[in-house]
A protein has these predicted regions:
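Helix-enriched interaction subdomains in cytosolic or periplasmic regions
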Residues: 1-6
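Soluble catalytic domains of membrane acyltransferases
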Residues: 7, 14-142
Length: 142
């Protein structure tokens, strides 16, 4: 309920202020495990992807974002923390659990925002989680 409310609010704001145009939603399967793998340019990328997707989306987010109050809001909206700089087994397991339950996990495979707009080297986590959960991977571009 809260997720849908926040998603619809962002959809209105993005449509009015950013003139958000979404293409390719027909490529998002209606059910089953799904990884949305996207480039990452801005702090607005997670709400843009969540708004554009036709299903509820869970996000891995750097653990530094999970400060009091804000971290609780992120968790209510389906995000979970990941420790960057190495293999965070708990976060990887949580991502696989989300996928194995037939849900959607959005990942920014580069692990950080691009400062130049160029694609960086992808980390192996997205492919590994999708493979273990037998999830479909849908690429996204913002």
């Amino acid at each position: 309920m809260i997720y849908t409310l926040v998603k619809n609010l962002f959809k209105i704001l993005f449509t009015i202020f950013l003139r958000l145009k979404v293409e390719g939603t027909e490529n998002i399967p209606k059910d089953g495990p799904l990884v949305i793998a996207s480039n990452h340019l801005s702090l607005l990328d997670p709400p843009v992807l969540g708004t554009a997707a036709t299903r509820k989306v869970h996000f891995m987010a750097k653990e530094e974002l999970f400060v009091p109050v804000l971290g609780t809001i992120y968790k209510i909206l389906g995000a979970f923390p990941v420790r960057r700089g190495g293999a965070d087994r708990a976060a990887i397991k949580h991502g696989i659990d989300i996928l194995e339950s037939g849900q959607v996990l959005a990942i920014f495979p580069e692990g950080t925002r691009s400062k130049t707009g160029e694609l960086g080297k992808a980390q192996p986590g997205a492919l590994m989680m999708a493979s273990k959960a037998k999830a479909t991977i849908v690429p996204a571009c913002i």
